[in-house]
Amino acid sequence: MTNNTDKQTLKKLERQILRKTTQVINQYNMIEDGDKIMVCLSGGKDSYCLLEMLLLLQKKAPISFEIIAVNLDQKQPGFPEEVLPNYLKNKGVEFHIIERDTYSIVKRVIPEGKTTCGLCSRMRRGILYDFAEENNVTKVALGHHRDDIIETFFLNLFYNGSIKAMPTKLLSDDKRNIVIRPLAFVSEKETLEYSQLKEFPIIPCNLCGSQDNLQRVFIKDMLNRWEQNNPERKNVIFKALSNISPSQMLDKELFDFINISKDDIQR
């Protein structure tokens, strides 16, 4: 950061992101007194932003909670092993680096040229969940932001024929962990600008050589085009995800259509 204008911009943006982070945490009761929160730190802009917001909140919150930053070193070629330890030591943050060679497994299983992201993410999630349980972590914090949630909604809608996105808070399927997404109200534009102003030591996400998920790229481009024509489009879509009318959908599990009968008519 080189001038006062940048410092003022950073201060304003930081307050804005922290306000949104605090808002979603309060609305969904994400953090409780005595929590041990594991921040999954990949070295990307979003996870750095997440860690920074939780550290700021930790200083101001009326409750007490622990933070531990955890990175999974998957032994991808060219991964800069020293970057995260050096950064976290300088910040005085408790951290742990898990070393697992999932890269070799993924390369062996997935044919050349195919995206490895699906298998890689499933393996990563399992390893992180195991670590959380073994270390008495009460909340696993992920860096997904508003745009990730919207994109996932459209991916499921267009390609899976289902209406679902990413919840802000969930109990894992095996009921071993609670996952929270404190950046759910924050846009990708905000995390990108914040990471640039803070000059985080970003680690590229494509060290494995995997191609981008073309479906997600298509959805992201579509949403960005919509946003150009209507700057509030993403906000409106995001609002819709918490404004659902089950009786106006077709899912019999969500609304009892079957038992609506002529006896219910009131005239």
Curated annotation (Swiss-Prot):
UniProt motif (PP-loop motif) ranges: 42-47
Pfam family membership, one: ATP_bind_3
GO MF annotation list: 4 iron, 4 sulfur cluster binding; ATP binding; magnesium ion binding; sulfurtransferase activity; tRNA binding
Catalytic activity: cytidine(32) in tRNA + S-sulfanyl-L-cysteinyl-[cysteine desulfurase] + AH2 + ATP = 2-thiocytidine(32) in tRNA + L-cysteinyl-[cysteine desulfurase] + A + AMP + diphosphate + H(+)
Free-text comment on the cofactor: Binds 1 [4Fe-4S] cluster per subunit. The cluster is chelated by three Cys residues, the fourth Fe has a free coordination site that may bind a sulfur atom transferred from the persulfide of IscS.
Keyword Membrane annotated: no
Keywords for the protein's UniProt record, in alphabetical order: 4Fe-4S, ATP-binding, Cytoplasm, Iron, Iron-sulfur, Magnesium, Metal-binding, Nucleotide-binding, RNA-binding, Transferase, tRNA processing, tRNA-binding
GO BP terms in the entry: tRNA thio-modification
Known pathway: tRNA modification
Gene Ontology CC terms, in alphabetical order: cytoplasm
Binding site for [4Fe-4S] cluster: 117, 120, 208
Secretion signal span: none
InterPro entries tied to this protein: Rossmann-like_a/b/a_fold, TilS/TtcA_N, tRNA_Cyd_32_2_STrfase, tRNA_thiolation_TtcA_Ctu1
Cellular compartment(s): Cytoplasm
E.C. number(s) listed in UniProt: 2.8.1.-
Swiss-Prot/TrEMBL cofactor(s): Mg(2+); [4Fe-4S] cluster
Keyword Translocase included in the entry's annotation: no
Misc note: The thiolation reaction likely consists of two steps: a first activation step by ATP to form an adenylated intermediate of the target base of tRNA, and a second nucleophilic substitution step of the sulfur (S) atom supplied by the hydrosulfide attached to the Fe-S cluster.
Matching HAMAP family: TtcA
NCBIfam families, alphabetized: PRK10696.1
The protein's role, per its UniProt record: Catalyzes the ATP-dependent 2-thiolation of cytidine in position 32 of tRNA, to form 2-thiocytidine (s(2)C32). The sulfur atoms are provided by the cysteine/cysteine desulfurase (IscS) system.
Subunit structure: Homodimer.
Family statement: Belongs to the TtcA family.
Protein name: tRNA-cytidine(32) 2-sulfurtransferase 2
Gene: ttcA2
